[in-house]
């Protein structure tokens, strides 16, 4: 072997050596017999370096995985012998190999097993067992090989081809017949021999049993001999976690409901008499987390049995199953309420399913009602934050608690389905007693009390948030709690979690303020002062900005008396903060978007006359326009690139803020009706010069483009005079991405204004196409994926543009471009349909083609178009689906084929018998299609039902492809 190259395998080797080692690995993979050197090195134990041994196994692995069928029988025998002699050597080694080498060896054994077991090596396991016997080194490797085989055969995370899946099923069937009983016996012997002397091997063996039990005959494991041993392991500290997991897999195995019930009950009796149900005596939380998972598995198994028995009408056994479930509830509750969240989380599935049973029962017993209440109290307690939760810097632990809370919320929702009255009463009790003394109560208890009120909104659902009408007792309970929330002063609590929960809840129950509007002023003040938008925590300020906009939007009819006051109070929050002023704004620019939107909503939805609305909107937007002009001048003069970028950002924010105010308008309150057209036209005139700024083009163009999109909706035809010059600037110095983002703007204008913009479209059609073609024809690096993707997206945008033009009744825009240009455009559409393996673009191209055939394909169409149909469009309908890249198993491709069928149908519709004749006598014979198939094709094409032809076409191409 190349000793110099092998030096590069050491993790501390320099990059040159590492490169050489990689190159050597590639060389050995390609060479037909170099792997034999590695096999010999392993069998002879030539190298002591761990990384070289690992390398040799990697080379063998590649050989078995990808080249095995190319090897001669002798070479295949050599690989088998190499592995067995390596295994024999492990029995005698003074030191065991490193874990990573043992794992890699096990993988190679497993690969060889799945390749050879059914054909050349049926005695695989017997050969291995005869080598390892009960030698601890050998047993360790045997168990690792079994786990590697399990992951090859059963692991759902590994994606298998259908051929591999069939092979794996056959292997498992054969193993069940030929060797599983022997393997199970070997596991029993290993467990018995090593349970007190080698915990590592015993735990490995328990893991193997747990993995295999899912697909072998359960009676081999679920018998007195085996189960008693597993239960014995539950009392040995170093084994009990693994034993717990193994029992969980046994319990989880699908089986007859009555047998499952008996198995679970017998397990429970032994565990209970051994003292495992006394949770409070146990201090090892890691074990309890596994035990909780086991109890969850047993509980859910009993519930599955109950469901099956009910479904089968076996009432007697169903009753027994329910009884068995009920006797586990006390244990479930102990685990649910445990202070360790992992232990609690592991039992939630059982708890949830138990509540689902209760929901189905017509009458609950007193004990069941007590259970529901106990679960409810447990959920309320467990929802509470602990002292360690870090609100300022949330890490992994905090994220896990947030996930755990989501699980508890599902339990709460399920509780509401079982007993809504009880839930409401329990929450009300906790809420009222906590809010009464909030000043002296710990933050986590105040937060959870408000949180519970918040959660009721989803737990007790109503349509359109109408919590305060309908059911009187429920409405009045919620109303009482909301009144307490807004009048208790709890919004002043000095903890971010309480503050945020207050605002979240106020917004969740905004309908309360239509019933009791007298509370609106105090809540508005909370939003606007140090409790909300001016809070010391940026997180609270940010969330409040969003919630404030929701609050104002949903209560816009109630806002009239407060509009001017609110606008005055948020004045400083609306300031565009230029990069050079140095002071940190209270709100980020994203948060300011919500404040601008809120201001827009207040003005537009006010009861003021149009002149007042216009004045207020001008007051809102004029400072932005003035700042914009100053900043644009500064940008033109800025030398430093970092400063240019921050100025461009600021300009972009200004445009974004103005855009956002326009979201307040609607069909009922248009810009015109509110008298605000002039203000937005002024904005347009202020912002458009940014398009001719040579610096920071991307960000400036993006902002102005978005603003234009909004103005097309809001100002309608008043925006049209600005479009030509804006388009001209945006088409200068274009990249693929610029064009791709510019085209939707033109599509929007075309679709909205149609004939009104025909002159503009005619004028800019070819300049736009030239810009697109120029970018598409630019050479790119062969393996530059991002450039290829950008071109693909631009191509799609180009076809989408043509689709919009043809679909908006504007085909004359294309027709008027001169014969040469028209042909060039049509050829690009044909190429799009046939050449590029992009089904989304292909679908669009066929839509364009069928539209053009519909418009121009008749007797009075443009000169030469009928020829084009037969020379190019008809062939495209066959050449595209016949390509290897046209995958009929892909959903997008099927949609493209569907449009291809529409195109052919449209040609037939416009050209009649002439089209059928052309297909019958010229085109299809040229493709060597058999006469009877041609006949069949033409008959399907002439069917009046388009769907018939679509279905036929798919079958036609499935048959035609090799």
UniProtKB/Swiss-Prot annotation:
The modification N6-acetyllysine is found at residue 634. One of its GO terms (biological process) is intracellular protein transport. It is found in: Nucleus; Cytoplasm. The keyword Cytoplasm applies. It comes from the Eukaryota. The keyword Cytoplasm applies. Residues 1-385 are annotated as: Necessary for interaction with Ran, nuclear localization and nuclear import. One of its GO terms (molecular function) is tRNA binding. It holds the Pfam family Exportin-T. Residues 443-962 are annotated as: Necessary for tRNA-binding, cytoplasmic localization and nuclear export. Belongs to the exportin family. Mediates the nuclear export of aminoacylated tRNAs. In the nucleus binds to tRNA and to the GTPase Ran in its active GTP-bound form. Docking of this trimeric complex to the nuclear pore complex (NPC) is mediated through binding to nucleoporins. Upon transit of a nuclear export complex into the cytoplasm, disassembling of the complex and hydrolysis of Ran-GTP to Ran-GDP (induced by RANBP1 and RANGAP1, respectively) cause release of the tRNA from the export receptor. XPOT then return to the nuclear compartment and mediate another round of transport. Found in a complex with XPOT, Ran and tRNA. Probably found in a complex with nucleoporins. Interacts with Ran and tRNA in a GTP-dependent manner. PANTHER family: EXPORTIN-T, EXPORTIN-T/LOS1. This is Exportin-T. The gene is XPOT.
């Amino acid at each position: 072997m190349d000793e110099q190259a092998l030096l590069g395998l050491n993790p501390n080797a320099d990059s040159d050596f590492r490169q050489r080692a990689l190159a050597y690995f590639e060389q050995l993979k390609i060479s037909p017999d170099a792997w034999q050197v590695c096999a010999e090195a392993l069998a002879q134990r030539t190298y002591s370096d761990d990384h070289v041994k690992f390398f040799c196994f990697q080379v063998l692995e590649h050989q078995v995985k990808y080249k095995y069928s190319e090897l001669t029988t002798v070479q295949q025998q050599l690989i088998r012998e190499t592995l067995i002699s390596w295994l024999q050597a492990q029995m005698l080694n003074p030191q065991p190999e490193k874990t990573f080498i043992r794992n890699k060896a096990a993988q190679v054994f497993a690969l060889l097993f799945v390749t050879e077991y059914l054909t050349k090596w049926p005695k695989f396991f017997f050969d291995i067992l005869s080598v390892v016997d009960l030698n601890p080194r050998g047993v360790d490797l045997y168990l690792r090989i079994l786990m590697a085989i399990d992951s090859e055969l059963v692991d759902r995370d590994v994606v298998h081809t259908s051929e591999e899946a069939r092979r794996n099923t056959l292997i498992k069937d054969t193993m069940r017949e030929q060797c599983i009983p022997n393997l199970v016996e070997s596991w029993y012997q290993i467990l018995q021999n090593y349970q007190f002397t080698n915990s590592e091997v015993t735990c490995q063996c328990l893991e193997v049993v747990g993995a295999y039990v899912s697909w072998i005959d359960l009676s081999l494991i679920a018998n007195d001999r085996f189960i008693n041993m597993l239960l014995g392991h539950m009392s040995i500290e170093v084994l009990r976690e693994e034993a717990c997991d193994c029992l969980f897999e046994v319990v989880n195995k699908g089986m007859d409901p009555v047998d499952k019930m008996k198995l679970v009950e017998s397990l429970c009796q032994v565990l209970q008499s051994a003292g495992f149900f006394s949770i409070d005596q146990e201090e090892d939380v890691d074990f309890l987390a596994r035990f909780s998972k086991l109890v969850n598995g047993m509980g859910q198994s009993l519930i599955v049995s109950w469901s099956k028995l009910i479904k089968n009408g076996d009432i007697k056994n169903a009753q027994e199953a329910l009884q068995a479930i009920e006797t586990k509830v006390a244990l479930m509750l102990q685990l649910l309420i445990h202070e360790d969240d992992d232990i609690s989380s592991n039992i939630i599935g059982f708890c949830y399913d138990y509540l689902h049973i209760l929901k189905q029962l017509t009458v609950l017993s007193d004990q069941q009602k007590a259970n529901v209440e106990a679960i409810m109290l447990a959920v309320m307690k467990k929802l509470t934050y602990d002292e360690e939760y870090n609100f300022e810097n949330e890490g992994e632990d905090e994220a896990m608690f947030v996930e755990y809370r989501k699980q508890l919320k599902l339990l709460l929702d399920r509780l509401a389905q079982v007993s809504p009255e009880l839930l409401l009463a329990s929450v009300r009790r906790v809420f009222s007693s906590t809010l009464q003394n909030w000043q002296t109560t710990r933050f986590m208890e105040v937060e959870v009390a408000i949180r519970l009120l918040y959660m009721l909104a989803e737990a007790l659902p109503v349509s359109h948030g109408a919590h305060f009408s309908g059911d009187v007792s429920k409405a009045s309970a919620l109303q009482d709690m909301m009144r307490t929330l807004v009048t208790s002063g709890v919004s002043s609590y000095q903890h971010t979690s309480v503050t945020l929960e207050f605002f979240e809840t106020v917004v969740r129950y905004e309908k309360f303020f239509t019933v009791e509007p007298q509370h609106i002023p105090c809540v508005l003040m909370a939003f606007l002062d140090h409790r909300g938008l001016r809070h010391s925590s940026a997180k609270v300020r940010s969330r409040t900005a969003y919630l404030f906009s929701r609050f104002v939007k949903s209560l816009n009819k109630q806002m009239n008396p407060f509009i001017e006051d609110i606008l005055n109070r948020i004045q400083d929050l609306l300031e565009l903060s230029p990069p050079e002023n140095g002071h940190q704004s209270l709100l980020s620019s994203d948060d300011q978007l919500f404040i601008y939107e809120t201001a827009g909503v207040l003005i537009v939805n006010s009861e003021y006359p149009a002149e007042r609305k216009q004045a207020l909107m001008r007051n809102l937007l004029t400072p932005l326009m003035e700042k914009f002009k100053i900043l644009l001048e500064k940008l033109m003069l800025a030398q430093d690139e970092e400063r240019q970028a921050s100025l461009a950002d600021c300009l972009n924010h200004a445009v974004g803020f103005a855009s956002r105010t326009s979201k307040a308008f609607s069909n009922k309150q248009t810009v015109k009706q509110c008298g605000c057209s002039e203000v937005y036209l002024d904005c347009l005139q202020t912002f458009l010069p940014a398009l001719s700024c040579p610096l920071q083009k991307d960000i400036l163009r993006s902002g102005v483009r978005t603003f234009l999109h909004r103005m097309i909706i809001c100002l309608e035809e008043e925006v049209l005079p600005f479009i030509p010059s804006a388009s001209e600037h945006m088409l200068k110095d274009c990249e693929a991405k610029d064009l791709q983002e510019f085209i939707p703007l033109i599509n929007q204008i075309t679709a909205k204004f149609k004939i009104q913009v025909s002159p503009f479209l005619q004028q800019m059609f070819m300049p736009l196409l030239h810009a697109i073609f120029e970018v598409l024809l630019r050479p790119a690096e062969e393996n530059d994926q991002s450039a290829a993707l950008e071109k693909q997206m631009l191509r799609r945008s180009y076809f989408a543009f043509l689709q919009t033009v043809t679909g908006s009744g504007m085909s004359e825009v294309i027709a008027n471009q001169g014969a040469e240009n028209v042909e060039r455009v049509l050829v690009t559409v044909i190429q799009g349909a046939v050449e590029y393996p992009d089904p989304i673009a292909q679908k669009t191209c066929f839509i364009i083609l069928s539209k053009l055939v519909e418009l121009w394909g008749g007797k009075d169409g443009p000169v030469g178009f009928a020829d084009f149909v037969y020379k190019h469009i008809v062939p495209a309908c066959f050449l595209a689906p016949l390509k290897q890249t046209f995958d009929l198993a892909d959903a997008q491709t099927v949609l493209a084929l569907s449009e291809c069928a529409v195109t052919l149908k449209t040609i037939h519709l416009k050209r009649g018998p002439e089209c059928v004749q052309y297909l019958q006598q010229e085109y299809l014979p040229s493709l060597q299609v058999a006469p009877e198939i041609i006949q069949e094709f033409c008959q399907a094409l002439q069917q009046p039902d388009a769907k018939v032809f679509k279905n036929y076409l798919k079958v036609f191409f499935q048959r035609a492809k090799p």
